[in-house]
Amino acid sequence: MAEQKDLDFTYTTIDEIFRLSMGESGDYSGAKYDGNFSMSLEEAQKAKHKFIADSLNITKGSKVLDMACGWAPFIRYIIHERNAESIGLTLSQGQADACQKNGYNVMVKDCRYVKPEDFGTFDAITCIGGLEHFCSVEEWQAGKQKEVYRDFFKTVHDLLPVGGRFYMQTMTFSKNMIEFEELDVNAKKGSAAYVMALMVKEFPGSWLPYGPEMVIKCAEPGFKLISQSSGRLDYIETIAQWRKKFRKFNLKKYWLYLSLIPRYFTDMEFRHLVAIFKVSPNKVCFEKEVMDHYRLVFEKV
Ligand SMILES: C[S@@+](CC[C@H](N)C(=O)[O-])C[C@H]1O[C@@H](n2cnc3c(N)ncnc32)[C@H](O)[C@@H]1O
């Protein structure tokens, strides 16, 4: 599993740059264009929020747990558009500080270990782009991946009433995934071996499920699947829009980029993180169908 230090590396490092690029409560997960790429990124993210809130029957007063909440974009939506109540959990201190400053009820807590005694139970639960971080390469190599996901679904199960719904979206490996031994940061630029090696650098402590089937199977028998759709093409467009926003000039942001230069020369891992901004390995992985992306709605039975 990714630990707090890993998630601080991935998210807290870019906290201010992210907020200056995407807004204080920007989404850092695939939007929902449904193939209509004339939509703006903001419209497509809002369409995603609406889809999730509708799928989970979130209305006025619903109590919602947003696991792996990032900078709280979904929390912002359900508070303002549905008058719902929400608690958000993240493992990035920078995200939690920013969310609290913006008035959201967000804390640093590992969502995989939440118990009903902590906050009570919920009407609905979301985990948007969190599962990717729950199983490490080492756990996968030790054959523990399914156990990790089953334990997670057990946690969610205990927090919902029968009939309560859970939404998750997650990247998965897809039909062109290569062998782990082939991953190599020195491989040909643009190759699956190279971009997958960068992915592992960008998301330390993280490994993906092998297709949605693995996730759906691990959710049984406590959950039935209500709906499933691939967001792979939508994610490619999302990343293309993120790249423009990260590059858009803003004096403070460019100053922050400059302030990171010394670290670039002294920290090899950080140098790989910078390469990610140039290459967008996840976009290449989606294009090559090394990876896919799924939106899954579950109901507790
Ligand atoms: C890709 S971001 C998605 C953020 C947000 N859901 C969104 O859509 O913008 C992944 C998030 O997962 C969080 N995360 C990963 N593992 C976690 C864990 N075990 N407990 C709580 N949060 C976790 C990270 O801190 C980060 O906020």
Task: Tell what function each PLM region has.
Residues 1-55:
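Conserved Class I S-adenosyl-L-methionine-dependent methyltransferase catalytic core
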Residues 61-68:
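Conserved class I S-adenosyl-L-methionine
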Residues 71-82:
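Conserved SAM-binding loop of SAM-dependent methyltransferases across substrates and taxa
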Residues 103-113:
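Conserved SAM-binding strand-loop segment of SAM-dependent methyltransferases
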Residues 114-125:
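A short acidic, Gly/Pro-enriched loop at the edge of an enzyme's catalytic core
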Residues 145-162:
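A short glycine-rich, Lys/Arg-flanked "PGG" loop and its adjoining helix->strand segment in the class I
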Residues 163-170:
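Conserved beta-strand signature within the Rossmann-like core of class I S-adenosyl-L-methionine
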Residues 172-290, 301:
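Substrate-binding/catalytic lobe of Class I Rossmann-like enzymes that use SAM or dcSAM, i.e.
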